[in-house]
Amino acid sequence: GLNPNALHQWYLGIYIDAFEWVELPNTVGMSQFADGGGLATKPYVSSAAYLDRMGDHCAGCRYDKKQKTTADACPFNALYWEFYDRHTRLLSHNPRIGMAYRQLEKMQPEAKEALFEKARSLRANLNAL
C-alpha cells in the first residue's frame, strides 16, 4: 500500500507554499482517507468513468477506460472495486457511497473475482504500469 505520511512529507518538500496545518489534513484525511474517516465523509477513490467525466485525463491514454479486466483495461477500474470490497466493514454503512456497494452486490461472483485478481496483479506490478 501507500504510506500517507511519506506522501505528506513529499508535498511539503516540493511545494513552497505548502503549510503543514493545511496540507496534513488534506493529504492524510481527505486524499488518503488514512484517518479512517475522521475528516472526510468518504474516501476519494474513482473509476475511469469518473476521471473521464471530470476532465481530459483519459484522452490519449493507452488504457481503455471502458474495460475492467482485460490487458488494456484502465487500472483505476479494478482498483476502485477492489478498494471498496477490501474496506467493506469500514465503509459499507456510509450512505454517501451506498450506491457503490449496491452495484458491487449485484455483480456476478466470477466478475467480482476477475476484478479483484486484476487489482492484485496491478498492485504487485505497479512499476510496469
Give each language-model segment a name:
Residues 1-129:
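C-terminal catalytic domain of photolyase/cryptochrome flavoproteins
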